[in-house]
Amino acid sequence: MNRKMLQVYFICGTSDCPKGKFLDVLEKALQAGITCFQFREKGEQGLTGADKLLLAKQVQHLCHRYQVPLIINDDVELARAIDADGIHLGQEDLSVVEARQLFPGKIIGLSVGTKEEYLNSPIDLVDYIGSGPVFPTLSKDDASPAIGMDGLKQLRKLNSDIPMVAIGGLSAKDCKEVLQAGADGIAVISAISHAEDPYKATKILVDGMQAMILKFNQVESNKQILKNP
């Protein structure tokens, strides 16, 4: 998996957007340059059954048009039905071992918020981890306590190689700190889905992240030049 996929990672479902606006919000985000999309259709108002499948196919069509990977949150049957690019699992969802057996060659992401969760997870079987919540968030009813940037740094110290995306109460202003903490990108829900102008909000995120990555790469390049003149 190319870790660039995690730079601006949008997570959304119909309950995260104004009624009837979900596909419009998604397309605006795709047009503005998100690097990955996770379809997370949950909650009492979320679609189920045939309606959810139909929407997932529409989502997949849009993601394919913009050449952006589509990850399905937790729903194994849906991910298999549409042959999604991957699946994202929480700590209480299907085991990673089973998921890898069901989805050979697909992208598997895992939510990891603490050292204990990291140590108890088969990290070698996942392609990336979603770490957080960094800050308190209203987007998930069952969100764990916030870990802060320090928590993000601690998770990165446990494994310097695993691709990691930060999530939880984040916005464009956090791009620099997220990268400094060791994450490869930023995952958002409401920063885009609740924005008055989803395209503009996404563009600010994308441009901010790209500018920071460019700056970080330049700093690393200068270090190498000084080390090997």
Swiss-Prot record:
GO cellular component: cytoplasm
Binding site for 4-amino-2-methyl-5-(diphosphooxymethyl)pyrimidine: 38-42, 73, 111, 140
Cofactor: Mg(2+)
Recorded GO MF terms: magnesium ion binding; thiamine-phosphate diphosphorylase activity
Keywords: Magnesium, Metal-binding, Thiamine biosynthesis, Transferase
Free-text comment on the cofactor: Binds 1 Mg(2+) ion per subunit.
Family: Belongs to the thiamine-phosphate synthase family.
Protein name per UniProt: Thiamine-phosphate synthase
